[in-house]
Amino acid sequence: MTDLPPHSSHHPADQGEPLVPAEKKQGVEAIREALKTIPYSPGVYRMLSEKGEVLYVGKALSLKKRVSSYIRINQLPERLRRMVSMTVSMEIVITRTEADALLLEANYIKRMKPRFNILLRDDKSYPWLMLTESHEFPQITKQRGKPVKGATYWGPFANAWAVNQTLNLVQRSFLLRSCSDAVLNSRTRPCLLYQIKRCSAPCVDRISKEDYAELVSEARQFLSGHSTELQQRLVAEMEQASQELNYERAASIRDRIRGFASIQGSSTINPTSINDADIMTIWQEAGQSCIQVFFIRGSRNNGNRAFYPAHAEEETAADVLSAFMIQFYDNKPPPPSILVNCELPEPKLVEEALSIRRGQKVEILRPQRGEKKDVVEHAALNAREALERKLAENTGQRRLLEGVAEVFGLPEIPQRIETYDNSHIMGQAPYGVMVVGGPEGFNKRAYRKYAIKGPVTPGDDFGMMREVMERRFGHRSENGERPEDWPDLLLIDGGLGQFNAVRAVLADLGVTGIPIVAIAKGPDRDAGREWFFTETKSPFQLPPRDPVLYYLQRLRDEAHRFAITTHRAGRSKGLRSSELDHVPGIGAARKKALLNHFGSAKSVRQASLEELENAPGISSSTATAIYGHFHPEWVQKTSADNRSH
């Protein structure tokens, strides 16, 4: 348990100024030049290319000694030789300690994503269980993002499924409400959760404040890892209720005890000897790594997640795990213990850095015996199986991409395929979308939505596609070089017209070297009979059972799915807009308060000035502004009366 999940992490303040060589030298000579002014202090260094791209970020106890190692070029592996050859300048930031440098290095790597560093690819936020404290009947719910002041949190959980499962089971055992304060205050009869024994219905006084407070106390005790003592007490209460012939209460307590058993038995890993810890294991194969992280809180498994950090093939498991660990905890507090399956190169330094981030001591352990060792081995087995599955998938994916290259005559296997589609209804809520596929499947972090800004004639899909292409490729690099995030293949959902529209836009923008393919549905829009339009071939079809055809259909269908969901979300947002959105001085909070009080925007518009002034959270001046917005003739009359006096 913790008072708040982190919203901002501890990052050492930047100290010192960037040091850049006065002359534009490159490679070893550029590093020699930088060494003239680099101190022996601890800190972080950044190696930059001629275009200003950050190639690598590193930390050191002694910056001068560490950077000096790069001038011994023959002792470096090929990857680092290439990095040094591209370096034209260096920047440094001095820190107080090496641990501070390690934290700052991780922060820079996550922000700048240097191509020669080990990178944590998946950096999603994690859900937490939150117990509010601002109401006499506290609410338990799940929460992500910015913490709510004064609330108590448990977590993190690996994913939404894990937190939902625990939330449901906690509701079954403790009957705490999950509804918002507004819903609680507006209820006149119990909701369905009360009927299915998931809530005690404090909204209609089916439970006293004292009894509800007792349930809250028990929930705290359970979620904080003291379930054994709680279960023993409840068993005693159940037996006493039975002896007193209070069978209804005994049955209620029995159901709660069963809920505990459900929580504890819902995972294969529920270690009794581990209270709060993360289990972090790595498995390497074929130059790739998988890291499995299990979240153990209160001796319960809060789920696990697999990560596949990007790194060079020669990186060792220990180096990858160490770099991953520091980046992983950049925006979340580490637990008191982290269990690993290999020795880190600098475990004490990592412990010191994570202890700074947590504000308390953090211990990194590699268990040698007992239950902890068994749990770590189980997590490592999960990492191995996940990596083997991914390698098998990547092998199949590579064959498909080889087939795509062969079908369309590409010079090499495409690493980035961008697929585009549009969606609108008679010109309303028009959106264009881009989805990205490659060797590792769909890259959803690279997906893009384009809300069409220009006027759209109903049915003018060509005009929509032109705007999307102009916005996607309109910004070129200053030196004319191809940006790194440009695609190796453009796949357009449409026929010859869409193909010609896209080709014309790219020609107008001076964009060359990007193959364009349009995929059009066949007769009667039958899947498997699609026509393909390219710049180098006459329109053609692929055999109905060709795996490459299936893959291209998947790309098109994913773009279509994303376009439809984006369009629907845009339409829904438009439908949710209200007359109150246009009233000056009315933000989201006041809008919500007005709708809760009056029931609808129409009722607000029809309300008298006195009724508006009596609404909760609405001041006299705000009420006047609202009334005046809906009654401009009243404003004119009032102004005229004031002038006459």
From Swiss-Prot:
Short name of one Pfam family: GIY-YIG
Top-level taxon: Bacteria
Main location per the UniProt record: cytoplasm
GO-annotated biological processes: nucleotide-excision repair; SOS response
Residue intervals of the UVR domain: 228-263
Location of region: Disordered: 1-20
Keywords assigned by UniProt, alphabetized: Cytoplasm, DNA damage, DNA excision, DNA repair, Excision nuclease, SOS response
Compartments in which it is found: Cytoplasm
PANTHER family: UVRABC SYSTEM PROTEIN C, UVRC/OXIDOREDUCTASE
Protein name: UvrABC system protein C
Organism in which the protein naturally occurs: Gluconobacter oxydans (strain 621H)
Underlying gene: uvrC
